[in-house]
Structures are given as structure tokens and as C-alpha cells.
């Protein structure tokens, strides 16, 4: 009889243990970020998300091993937080908002500035990369964009702009037809 009373207690303890010992989904999200080339945009910068999906399609056609995906943040604050802490390697913003991010002004005034390197322009949009984004990856990404340029409305090399900008070194190498850098 005593064993019959212990069974419900054991089940309750086992249930509590399973709840607290279960794996967090965050580990899977980190693995997802490592397996896919994520291009972040934000709801607050309306044209960025639809264009990021087009960009992802072109990248995946030209460079399938990148397994590129569009990612969308809800707010500019979230964008700045994820990008400035190296959680997202690439960011697509309108030129106005990209300048604001780099200077910590405008919509990013209360969040602060973030350092970034230019990969490519698409009309009023700019693709930015983390300064720590490997030169080899920037070279591969730029090369994929160049090969898929006909499918990317308004794609413009950063070398064609008249303003002085901070272009990613790997992008410069690809645009100058230099060989792919080592990792």
C-alpha cells in the first residue's frame, strides 16, 4: 500500500524534473544562426524585409551553401542590439537609417552607434556587415551578388558611389577581381 502512495509522488517529481531539465530552444536558435547566413531587416524600415527576401533568393541561387535566410527584427532598438553585439552578421537598411545607425543619430539616437562595413547598395537600401565578418565570406557574398545582379533591382557596386564610405575589405577584393582570401 505504501508503494501505491509513492507512485503519484514519483510521477509529480518526474514531471517537475522534466520541466526544469528540458532543453532550452535558445541552443537550437544559436545552431540555426551558425548554419544559415542571416540577413536582418526591420519592420520599422518598411522596404527592407521584402527586398531581403529577394536578396536571399538570389544569394541561394548563386551560393547555395550559404543557406541564406531573411530575418526581421520588430524595432530599430532590436536591430541595434543584435547587430552591435555580433548576433547578426548582415543588415539591410535604407540609406538614411544606415547612416543613423553608424552615427548613433535619428532613429538610433537612444540606442547608440554601431560599427559596420558596406557590402552593396540596392537603390535606397544598403547591405551592411559586421566589421568582424570574415573577408572570405564578404568576397563570396559580393561575388554572388555580382553574378545575380540582373535579378536585384538597383544593385550598385559601392565602388561606384561618389561619397567616401567604409567598404568591407572582402567586398573590395571581389569588386577588384582579386582572388578569394583565405579564412
What residues fall within each predicted segment?
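Immediate post-signal peptide segment of exported/extracytoplasmic ligand-binding proteins
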Residues: 25-39, 171-183
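Short, well-ordered beta-strand elements
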Residues: 33-48, 68-71
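A bilobed periplasmic-binding-protein/Venus flytrap-type ligand-binding module shared by bacterial periplasmic
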Residues: 41, 119-137
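Short, polar/charged alpha-helical segment
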Residues: 48-64
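Short helices/loops that flank or line small-molecule/ion binding pockets
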Residues: 53, 76-91
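Short helix-initiation/N-cap motifs at beta->coil->alpha
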Residues: 64-81, 162
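A ligand-binding cleft/hinge motif common to bilobed small-molecule-binding domains
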Residues: 88-110
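An extracytoplasmic/periplasmic, membrane-proximal ligand-sensing/linker region
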Residues: 151-183
